[in-house]
């Protein structure tokens, strides 16, 4: 079954993912090549956000990834909380998750939402950035998938060496 699923995903990556608003969600092939084995739930990012976020923006990418994986915010009391279409700019997502009752923290976990304070880690000062944690490595570094980092509307991947005071996390659950 894994081979069948992998073949289906490979085909989708090559063809792109149709969106109702006309956008195409694709994983950047060059960026994907080195991280394929480290992706959360062994699935390649793609699909629609189901929330009407602006296609290609970082907020759209995280909403689409959560939608694809069937993830919800993990509530502080274990409940499952849906993200909303007004989570704010990228730098606001973790604070909004907290205000909705979501569990947040400063430690990366696979499947978490990660917000970057504006003007840090290569983000715009006004909006910040949001990404999805695909994997946490033994040394504390973590792999993120993201859209609109550096203006690229496709999913790209980068490894963050460690969490710092400009990074916060909202935790998710299935």
Residue ranges and their predicted role:
Residues 1-13:
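Alpha-helical oligomerization segments with coiled-coil/rod-like character
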Residues 17-130, 135-137, 145-146:
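Secreted/periplasmic proteins that engage bacterial cell-wall peptidoglycan
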Residues 8-9, 38, 51, 153, ...:
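Intrinsically disordered, low-complexity segments enriched in small/polar residues
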Residues 11-12, 41, 54, 138, ...:
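Compositionally biased, intrinsically disordered low-complexity regions enriched in proline and serine
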Residues 8, 59, 92, 168-170:
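Residues in intrinsically disordered, low-complexity segments of regulatory proteins
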């Amino acid at each position: 079954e894994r081979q069948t699923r992998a073949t289906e995903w490979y085909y989708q990556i090559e063809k792109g993912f149709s969106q109702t608003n006309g956008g195409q969600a694709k994983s950047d092939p060059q960026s994907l090549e080195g991280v394929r084995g480290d992706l959360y739930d062994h699935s390649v990012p793609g699909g629609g956000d189901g929330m009407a976020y602006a296609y290609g923006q970082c907020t759209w990418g995280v909403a689409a990834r959560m939608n694809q994986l069937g993830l919800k915010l993990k509530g502080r009391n274990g409940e499952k909380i849906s993200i909303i279409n007004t989570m704010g700019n990228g730098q606001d997502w973790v604070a909004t998750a907290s205000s909705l009752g979501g569990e947040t923290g400063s430690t990366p976990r696979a499947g978490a939402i990660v917000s970057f304070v504006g003007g840090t880690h290569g983000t715009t000062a006004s909006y910040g950035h949001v990404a999805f944690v695909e994997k946490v490595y033994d040394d504390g570094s973590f792999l993120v998938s993201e859209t609109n980092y550096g203006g690229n509307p496709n999913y790209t991947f980068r490894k963050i060496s460690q969490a710092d005071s400009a990074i916060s996390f909202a935790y998710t659950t299935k």
